[in-house]
């Protein structure tokens, strides 16, 4: 005899709250979810998350510092940093022969540190 399991991931009947649905649909209008999705895609790369975390720990780091931290070449570090800069996760400033990177703003730091705290809760139970 085969055991039947209920699907707990979906409603058993289709019924929705029209007022709630219309309110939320209205709130979705005009939002730039494509840019938000792009930001999360860039952060889906483990190396870039490490770089972003490093930038949370220090006010700024030069490309050489980042390369040393992640154990790669300056060119590779610069490539990853460019992705972070293009989506306003990080910003850069050239000083003489060095380029320094920092987080674009406090929102990014909050986002990253909140995600890290959430992940740590999962691991620690």
Which residues fall in each region the model found?
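N-terminal leader segment of winged-helix/HTH proteins
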Residues: 1-43
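A general structural signal for short secondary-structure boundary/capping elements
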Residues: 12-13, 85-88, 118-119
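N-terminal helix-turn-helix DNA-binding core of bacterial DNA-binding proteins
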Residues: 26-73, 99-106
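Base-recognition residues in the alpha-helical recognition helix of bacterial helix-turn-helix
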Residues: 53, 79-82
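Conserved segment of winged-helix/HTH DNA-binding domains
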Residues: 57, 100-125
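DNA-recognition element of transcription regulators
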Residues: 75-77
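Beta-hairpin "wing" of winged helix-turn-helix
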Residues: 85-95, 102
């Amino acid at each position: 005899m085969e055991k039947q399991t209920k699907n707990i991931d979906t409603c058993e009947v289709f019924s929705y709250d029209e007022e709630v649905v219309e309110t939320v649909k209205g709130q979705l209008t005009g939002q730039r979810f494509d840019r938000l999705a792009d930001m999360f895609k860039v952060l889906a790369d483990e190396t870039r998350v490490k770089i972003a975390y490093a930038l949370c720990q220090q006010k700024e780091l030069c490309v050489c510092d980042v390369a040393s931290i992640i154990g790669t070449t300056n060119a590779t570090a610069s490539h990853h940093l460019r992705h972070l800069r293009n989506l306003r996760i990080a910003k850069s400033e050239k000083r003489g022969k060095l380029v320094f990177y920092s987080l674009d703003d406090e929102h990014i730091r909050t986002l990253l540190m909140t995600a890290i705290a959430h992940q740590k809760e999962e691991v620690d139970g």
